[in-house]
Amino acid sequence: MSTTTCQVVAFLLSILGLAGCIAATGMDMWSTQDLYDNPVTSVFQYEGLWRSCVRQSSGFTECRPYFTILGLPAMLQAVRALMIVGIVLGAIGLLVSIFALKCIRIGSMEDSAKANMTLTSGIMFIVSGLCAIAGVSVFANMLVTNFWMSTANMYTGMGGMVQTVQTRYTFGAALFVGWVAGGLTLIGGVMMCIACRGLAPEETNYKAVSYHASGHSVAYKPGGFKASTGFGSNTKNKKIYDGGARTEDEVQSYPSKHDYV
């Protein structure tokens, strides 16, 4: 998969994940009434992070928001905080990833800058997905605990022969939406981090070459400029060599042992 394709797929997955997180946070069906023991009922109750609703058999639905903050369970407030943090980080990462797309050119932005922005958005998407998954999982754990506690309290008295009427809640649709959305955001963040490696410029290693200056020296004197190139010394040496060398005629003028034969 090319870098551009990986980046675009990660961007689309992150958009879907962020939209799912927003939808799950605003949904009212985080917990729904368990109808296992009473499938036919005139009232159906379900609750969300922000309000609780009651739907009657006639089709009329009445929702009542939570008018208190401090009176809510600590776990519910923690779930709210996790979902909000996940949405904020996902929105910031989405904004950064738009400018980091390789198929979009903004001025003279270098590939190294796009690589850094891609890595930043990928980390934000990963943290956003983890926050969403953690928030939904905490709420699900709270539902499971309350469900079994309510089940135990229903069969009390006379050796468990007397069954009391008590409302139990089970998983709502918002939990599954949140899990899927968090997973999509997490996958998008991982793919963004993978695409960052393709955008990073490759480092080129150059071999060091030693450079030696020429042997010509330049001498500076207060009286003026005089360049000493070394030709004078070479001329003198040449004259000495020429003076010491014998010409061919001079060599032949001296008698040798072969001349007397």
From Swiss-Prot:
Sequence ranges on the Cytoplasmic membrane side: 1-6, 102-122, 196-261
Record-given protein name: Claudin-18
Function: Involved in alveolar fluid homeostasis via regulation of alveolar epithelial tight junction composition and therefore ion transport and solute permeability, potentially via downstream regulation of the actin cytoskeleton organization and beta-2-adrenergic signaling. Required for lung alveolarization and maintenance of the paracellular alveolar epithelial barrier. Acts to maintain epithelial progenitor cell proliferation and organ size, via regulation of YAP1 localization away from the nucleus and thereby restriction of YAP1 target gene transcription.
Residue ranges of the region described as Required for role in regulation of RANKL-induced osteoclast differentiation: 195-261
Record family assignment: Belongs to the claudin family.
First-listed, main subcellular location of the protein, grouped into a coarse class: other
Pfam families per the UniProt record, alphabetical: PMP22_Claudin
Positions carrying Phosphoserine: S214
GO molecular function, one term: identical protein binding
Complexes and interactors: Interacts with TJP2/ZO-2. Interacts with TJP1/ZO-1. Interacts with YAP1 (phosphorylated); the interaction sequesters YAP1 away from the nucleus and thereby restricts transcription of YAP1 target genes.
Chain residue ranges for the region called Disordered: 242-261
Domain of life assignment: Eukaryota
Single biological process term from Gene Ontology: cell adhesion
Region forming the signal peptide: none
Organism this protein belongs to: Homo sapiens (Human)
Coiled coil (UniProt feature): none
Keyword Cell membrane on entry: yes
Membrane-spanning segments: 7-27, 81-101, 123-143, 175-195
Cell location: Cell junction, Tight junction; Cell membrane
